Each structure stands twice: as structure tokens, then as C-alpha cells.
Amino acid sequence: MADLEEQLSDEEKVRIAAKFIIHAPPGEFNEVFNDVRLLLNNDNLLREGAAHAFAQYNLDQFTPVKIEGYEDQVLITEHGDVGNGKFLDPKNRICFKFDHLRKEATDPRPYEAENAIESWRTSVETALRAYVKEHYPNGVCTVYGKKIDGQQTIIACIESHQFQAKNFWNGRWRSEWKFTITPSTAQVVGILKIQVHYYEDGNVQLVSHKDIQDSLTVSNEVQTAKEFIKIVETAENEYQTAISENYQTMSDTTFKALRRQLPVTRTKIDWNKILSYKIGKEMQNA
């Protein structure tokens, strides 16, 4: 191991550390960071070299953050990145600094929104918040209105998590939806992601995603928002149901096939009488 450490450059060490951090399971960033910190044994190198990994992790995970003085949480996503470590809260029309390591928001300041699309964004946000409140008890959503390639586009992001470290599991739901405001009909594109880590008596991760495409009738802001939420609700319900059914089937069939119910001898071992067995005597003599 010592020879391997001598062969690795600082750049290679940081690259490996960054990969560990980016792939940290939901709710376990601090644990992975602390482990990597011990392995690297160079705080300055870690902070400077792996800073991009801290940021990438928060962007990928849709990390929610509370801004002092404001009621609702906002998600850290690539769509809200306005540069120089600042992010947008479109609901409150502010931008703020975000510390990717401490996961803290500071210095909120007014920020001009895309006024031409704000009424559409607000309508979708109102409808989406009601949907998230009903379906995700711990859910957070952020809705952006942006011009992309000259087209007015709505981007809706949802995050919900359950961190149960005492019970040895953590999980996170993420979904991202986009549609462009065009006459008559718009294409809706979505991606749904589930990540769960269970680590009691083993180490198992569920990582799943699904791409969605649908069409949306565009009329006025309020009606379009209602139709959009119907698409979101149907797709997310179907995905979650399919995941549950799939893993129930695997539990009933696939997992059971991975092990014998009895040893090859077709006889269970009585561990209280292990010393009377030949293997017990061999262990005693060892």
C-alpha cells in the first residue's frame, strides 16, 4: 500500500477522492467526505482540488437549502446557477451565495426574473407546489422560467428524501420536467430518478431512472399548468408503482433463487451442538 501511495501524484489522489465524493449516496456526503479526508490526509489539497466535486454533488442531488428570512426551501440545480457561486430562488426573485461544503445559503439579494415568462412560471409553480405537498410529505420543488435557444421554457424540479441513518438506510427522489411555451401543443420531457442505500447486514444500492416524453396542450397559463401537472402525476405514479412491483417480484423469485434454503446436505446445522460435529473438533484442534 505504501508503494502505491508513493506512485500516486497529488492530482491522481484528488481525482480518486472526487469520484468518491460525487458518488456518495444521498444523505451520506459528510461521512464520505470525512473518510476521504482521512485517506488523503491533506485538507488544503482536498478543499482546493475537489471543490468541483462538492459542487457537482449538490447540483446532481438537487440539494435543498433554507435561506434565512424566507419561508420555503429552494433547490440547488444547474438551472439556478447564475455564476460565481450564486444561485437563483425564482419564487422570491433573489439570488444567494451557496457554500457547497457547508451547504449554507448567505447574502440573498434581489434578482431580475424573465418578466415575459414570469406569469407562466408562477402558474406552474403554484400547481406544482400543491402536487408536491399532496404526494411528497418532505418534498421541495423549484420552477424556473428561462429562454433557451430563444424559446420560452419552463423547467420544474422536484426533490424528496428520507434519511434514516439510525435504521441504516437513506433515499432520495428527483424529477426534472421541461416544456417550451409554443402555440397549440408543446412537448414535455422529463427524467425521474430514485436512489436508495441500505447498509444494515450488507451494502445494497438501488439506482434507477426513467425518461419521459409526452405532449401538452397549450392554452392559458392556469389551464396549461393543470394539464402539465396531470402528465407529471401520471408518469410519476406509474414509475413508482412499477418500481414497487418489480422489486416485489424480485423478492419473491430472483432473490430466493440466489441461495439454498438448506445446505447441500439438506440438513440444518444445530449450532448449539457444533462441538459434537467433526468440523467442531477440527476447529478445537486448530
From Swiss-Prot:
GO biological process, alphabetically ordered: actin cytoskeleton organization; barbed-end actin filament capping
Subunit structure: Component of the F-actin capping complex, composed of a heterodimer of an alpha and a beta subunit. Component of the WASH complex, composed of F-actin-capping protein subunit alpha (CAPZA1, CAPZA2 or CAPZA3), F-actin-capping protein subunit beta (CAPZB), WASHC1, WASHC2, WASHC3, WASHC4 and WASHC5. Interacts with RCSD1/CAPZIP.
Classification via SUPFAM superfamilies: Subunits of heterodimeric actin filament capping protein Capz
One protein family per Pfam: F-actin_cap_A
UniProt organism field: Carollia perspicillata (Seba's short-tailed bat)
Source taxonomy: Eukaryota, Metazoa, Chordata, Craniata, Vertebrata
Any one Gene Ontology cellular component term annotated for this protein: F-actin capping protein complex
Top-level taxon: Eukaryota
UniProt similarity note: Belongs to the F-actin-capping protein alpha subunit family.
Phosphoserine sites (modified residues): S9
PANTHER family listed in its UniProt record: F-ACTIN-CAPPING PROTEIN SUBUNIT ALPHA, F-ACTIN-CAPPING PROTEIN SUBUNIT ALPHA-2
InterPro entries referenced in this protein's UniProt entry, alphabetically: CapZ_alpha, CapZ_alpha/beta, CapZ_alpha/beta_2, CapZ_alpha_1, F-actin_cap_asu_CS
Its biological purpose: F-actin-capping proteins bind in a Ca(2+)-independent manner to the fast growing ends of actin filaments (barbed end) thereby blocking the exchange of subunits at these ends. Unlike other capping proteins (such as gelsolin and severin), these proteins do not sever actin filaments.
Record has Phosphoprotein as a keyword: yes
GO molecular function: actin filament binding
Alphabetized UniProt keyword annotations: Acetylation, Actin capping, Actin-binding, Phosphoprotein
Protein name: F-actin-capping protein subunit alpha-2
Residue positions where N-acetylalanine is found in the record: A2
